[in-house]
């Protein structure tokens, strides 16, 4: 089906690329894509295009990569050029998903139908940069995707529609991300169809109660504090897959833990102490309960099931993982 509603798209990672693909494949004209500049990544730290840019280039969609859209920011010239490009590119609405750049009021005012954001949480809970990670880390039973009409606040715009998603006990950020990306793609296509048909989308202001913020994940958060309860640490491991991973330091080596589950405590071992190292999992004492770690990765190695990890890097009861620096 061919549509007439013209959509400028702004986004960067895979979550956004899923939405761009759905919009494009649904037949909406996409005259321009905005995405962040190429960044160094991987072992060789070579410049890598974003997932959104890769899709746009593959499908012949024009791409712009301004480092900023704020005239008063660090890149005023580039911002001015990008804003002029937006003004001179005929379009009706802008869709924004995990773009990573702030949109000033000047930009929000350019599209006739405004800017619609796809946010990976049930707003107003988990506004901010890392809503999927924080929902798992906090032990939320459900999360979802919200479409909102953007304003200059941080994810404060009026809500157009939402989809709810249960968080499974074994969900990681990676697995939950994929389901939310699919839901976001479906929601935005449905919303654009209605916008084209009706000329506007009803939106409801966010409630004042229940606001929380999902701060960006930092590498410093990766270190496991074994004094915490086992269920808290298990959620941390799941929340930090694929980035930055849960990290446990043993004899100066940072071992990444990728899968773990809380189990009953065994004895009264000091938190961080390995109480059993079996093929089924490495059991580590925690502040309350214990953690069975079933997937590990040594420095420079690959993720391995506990059985394979122990075959090449034996661990033994009585060894103790260090507490985080400053603990």
UniProtKB/Swiss-Prot annotation:
Alphabetically ordered keywords of this record: Protein biosynthesis, Transferase
GO molecular function: methionyl-tRNA formyltransferase activity
Catalytic activity, as annotated: L-methionyl-tRNA(fMet) + (6R)-10-formyltetrahydrofolate = N-formyl-L-methionyl-tRNA(fMet) + (6S)-5,6,7,8-tetrahydrofolate + H(+)
Top-rank EC class of the record's enzyme: transferase
Pfam family, one: Formyl_trans_N
Gene3D superfamilies: Formyl transferase, C-terminal domain, Formyl transferase, N-terminal domain
Entry GO terms, CC: cytosol
InterPro entries, A to Z: Fmt, Formyl_trans_C, Formyl_trans_C_sf, Formyl_transf_N, Formyl_transf_N_sf, Formyl_transferase-like_C_sf, GART_AS, Met-tRNA-FMT_C
SUPFAM superfamilies assigned to the protein according to its UniProt record, in alphabetical order: FMT C-terminal domain-like, Formyltransferase
Keyword Hydrolase attributed: no
Domain of life: Bacteria
Residues given in the record as (6S)-5,6,7,8-tetrahydrofolate binding sites: 121-124
EC annotation from Swiss-Prot or TrEMBL: 2.1.2.9
Disulphide-bridged cysteine pairs: none
CDD domains documented for this protein: FMT_core_Met-tRNA-FMT_N, Met_tRNA_FMT_C
Entry similarity comment: Belongs to the Fmt family.
NCBIfam families per UniProt: fmt
Protein role: Attaches a formyl group to the free amino group of methionyl-tRNA(fMet). The formyl group appears to play a dual role in the initiator identity of N-formylmethionyl-tRNA by promoting its recognition by IF2 and preventing the misappropriation of this tRNA by the elongation apparatus.
Record-given protein name: Methionyl-tRNA formyltransferase
UniProt organism field: Burkholderia ambifaria (strain MC40-6)
């Amino acid at each position: 089906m061919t549509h007439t509603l013209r959509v400028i798209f702004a986004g960067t990672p895979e979550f956004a690329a899923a939405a761009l693909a759905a919009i494009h494949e649904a037949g909406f004209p996409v005259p321009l894509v905005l995405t962040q500049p190429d960044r160094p990544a991987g072992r060789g730290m070579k410049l890598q295009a974003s997932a959104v840019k890769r899709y746009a280039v593959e499908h012949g969609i024009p791409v712009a990569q301004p480092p900023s859209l704020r005239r008063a920011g660090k890149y005023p010239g580039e911002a001015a050029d990008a804003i002029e490009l937006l003004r001179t590119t005929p379009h009706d609405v802008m869709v924004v998903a995990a773009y990573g750049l702030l949109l000033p009021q000047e930009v929000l005012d350019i599209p006739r139908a405004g800017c619609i954001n796809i946010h990976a949480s049930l707003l107003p809970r988990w506004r901010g940069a890392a809503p999927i990670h924080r929902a798992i880390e906090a032990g939320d039973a459900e999360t979802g995707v919200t479409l909102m009409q953007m304003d200059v606040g941080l994810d404060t715009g009026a809500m157009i529609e939402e989809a709810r998603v249960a968080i499974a006990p074994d969900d990681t950020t990676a697995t939950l991300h994929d389901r939310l990306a699919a839901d976001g793609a479906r929601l935005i296509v449905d919303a654009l169809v209605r916008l084209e048909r009706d000329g506007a989308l009803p939106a409801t202001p966010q409630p004042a109660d229940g606001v929380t913020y999902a701060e960006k994940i930092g590498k410093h958060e990766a270190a496991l504090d074994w004094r915490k309860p086992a269920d808290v640490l298990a959620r941390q491991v799941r929340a930090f897959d694929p980035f930055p991973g849960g990290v446990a330091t043993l004899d100066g080596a940072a071992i990444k833990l990728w899968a773990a589950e809380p189990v009953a405590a065994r004895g009264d071992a000091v938190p961080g102490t390995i109480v059993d190292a079996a093929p089924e999992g490495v059991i580590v004492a925690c502040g309350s309960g214990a953690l069975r770690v079933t997937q590990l990765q040594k420095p420079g190695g690959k993720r391995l099931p506990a059985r394979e990890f122990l075959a090449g890097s034996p661990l033994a009861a009585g060894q103790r993982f260090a507490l985080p620096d400053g603990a």
